[in-house]
Amino acid sequence: MYINLYKTYISRTVNNQGGVCMAKFTFRCHKLAAAICTAALLMPVSVQAKRLTILYVPLDNRPVCSAYVKQTMEAANCKIILPPEKYIATNEKNGNPEAIWDWLEHKAPKADAAVISTDSLVYGGLVGSRTHNVSQEELQKRVNHLYKLKTTLPIKLYAFSTIMRTPRASKGRVEPPYYSTIGPSIFAYSQLLDKQDQGKLSPAEKLTMQALERNMKKAELGDWLERREKNLLVNQELTRMARNGKFHYFAIGKDDNATLSATHMEGRKISLSTFDMSRDCFQILDGVDQLGLLLIARAYNEANGTKPSVYPLYSVGAGASTLPQYSDARLQDSVPQQIIAAGAVQAQSADNADLILALNTPQDGIVKDSTADDNQPFASAGNKNFVGILGQLLRSGRNVSLADISYSNGADNGFMSLLANSINLQPLAAYNGWNTADNAVGYAIAQGLIARDMSSEARSRLLRQRLIDDWFYQSNARRSISNELEKHNREDLKYDLATEEKNILQQITADCQSMANSYSITRGTKFTLSFPWKRLFEVDVEIKK
């Protein structure tokens, strides 16, 4: 039933958002933006930030969503308060929306702002948004609770939601169980569904789409489409709230995505119904896991009356025209959007920019996974050119944050080996090369902007944490242990470490420590690693010294 219902639903233009944005609200947003810009002109970015307290409801307890966010902001003397751990989603359970509501209302009077994941308050977390069986009535009840939040909490609310992802394949417990077997078919089906919605489906593709439908169990495909329809309705309600001023700022993130997919299609629907809304109030962004830190950076900048400027500097080659994996937008479109989301503006030149966002991209514009055979510790001519430019910038005292996005899910080994051996990386504001390009870019912007208010010691700890995680672990230690597990037909352990967790942890710690000892920037660093979700995909890096 839901197969046809979903097709019918998404075929309608989503244009029931209340018409053109109310003039009064739009004027208020533009007036606020003008006031912030004026303040930025009168106040230098380097002013000492005042002590802030921000309530933060994360997507779940993964380090990139929780611990790393808290550590980043507290390094800049900003107090971040999270709900008790037992209320936050983990790899084994959903979060507790009702308990988080109560916690928010109790803590709000003593905070300056709140940054909230609506997925946590509606579905119980990111994985919950992909696997829930919550009724439409209950979802509407939770959205209504959100609607009242503005009057309940006397502070600025920054919120973010997600459009359910459409992965090519997925294993583990982060999707419905059937996705591990029919995921590729669902992805192919969603691509054709997107083309059909745009009126571009050929007769041959229509037959393929029908064949895919026949070869999947109706109950399983129907379950997936039903959940998508429910979540799309929730996002439409949330954008209405943003239009009516219920949030100070609201963003929707497109999780693992492609230029043809259900995620892309639903993003297009929402874009059509919100085209008239100011980007000072609402945005649709690529990527999800970086949004918590990105919105906190926005709250931080606005609270301190600053609107810093960011200049994107690309390595030689495709650069801004690169289309990353897991994204439906080229960097020339997605990077400026994330700069805006952080409460900053894009500079027209590097000369007077408060932050230079250096982006290491593949010369040919083709992004591969960090496990690719060519991700070796040998620098290309393009690498050498970009390292030379970065060295000049750092030696001249410029504020530089590096997004290493030539590969997905880890660092560019050739580029980073040359960089770490050629120049002093201590002055670098931030480094990020984790997960998707959009994740890494968002973190690089946020950490780069916040670094101005950190001590050199605090900044160094965060820098070394990311180098150990994104470079040493993701591109090397994880790759090595994955290859070994596959060789012994134990690929299952990548998604559930089970009884081998201790042995694998010892091996990856030794590998990361060996690499740390090889480079001056990390030599002597004391750190521990752990597997917060009992799988290989992510580690928690804790810097001891």
Region spans (language model):
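Sec/Tat signal peptide C-region and signal peptidase I cleavage site
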Residues: V45-A49
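Bacterial N-terminal signal peptides that target proteins for export
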Residues: A23-A34
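An N-terminal assembly and electron-transfer interface module characteristic of large anaerobic redox
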Residues: K50-K545
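Short, Lys/Arg-enriched N-terminal segments with co-localized hydrophobic residues
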Residues: M1-C21
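Generic N-terminal initiation segments characterized by hydrophobic and/or small/turn-forming residues
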Residues: Y2, C29, T38-A39
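Generic detector of N-terminal low-structure segments
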Residues: T13, F27-C29, E302
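Bacterial N-terminal signal peptides
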Residues: A34-P44
